[in-house]
Amino acid sequence: EELCTINPTAEIFLGEISEKVLKGISRIIASPGITDSHPFLAAAHSNGIEVISDIQLFVAEADAPLVAVTGSNGKSTVTTLLNLMCDSAGKSSLAGANLGVPALDLLIKDKPDFYILELSSFQLKRTQDLPVMVAVLLNISSDHLDWHTTEQEYRKAKYHIFSGAESAVFNRGDADAVAHFPRDIRSLSFGLDEPDGDGYGLRNDAGDVFLSYG
């Protein structure tokens, strides 16, 4: 009903979608829950139709710096903390995407100082351009293999968060992630070991463990 109000001429299809609908379509914004193996999307790819995420559409319209967070675990917590940190620093921010408010719904709110996006591997895979100010990759474990088929495909989607980043935060304890990390951007690492240089880690001082930098 809301869509009909916004665009009365839009055609709405409910249930199974016939491949005949593909005629005349140049782009599909697909739900992240639908895999590329779905017959409709598979047919779209076969016909050379671009399939993108809502995030791709969002970044084309957003006019404030973006901070993107991904990882198998902890991304919702970190996204929420970053939002609270902005508030404590006197900066306005809006958090969403894979957490809470859908990314496109953030665009109808007042422009913030920062957008903080939690991104899933599904969203990252279908997002070609991701010009973020800071990209954060927390960790990667075998997950969502029903969607990505292999762990390497899953990792490839996660690593895409760095593709257009100005700066990045990454887990140096993941050797594969370190190997795929771009060397031409500013970076900050973290880990459970002692920090060495520009990063955070844990130091043991006479039995007391401290979070330490440098």
State each model region's role.
Residues L14-E16, I52-D54, S189-D193:
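Short beta-strand elements of ligand-binding domains
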Residues E1-P8, P102-D105:
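N-terminal beta-loop-helix "entrance" segment that forms/cooperates
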Residues T5-K23:
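Glycine-rich, highly charged phosphate/nucleotide-binding loops
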Residues E19-G24, P32-R172, D176-R186, G201-N204:
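Phosphate-binding loop of NTP-binding sites
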Residues L107-I108, D193-P195, Y213:
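Active-site loops of AMP-binding adenylate-forming
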Residues I6-T9, G199, R203:
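Conserved catalytic and cofactor-binding micro-motifs
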Residues Y200-L202, A206-G214:
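Short polybasic amphipathic segments
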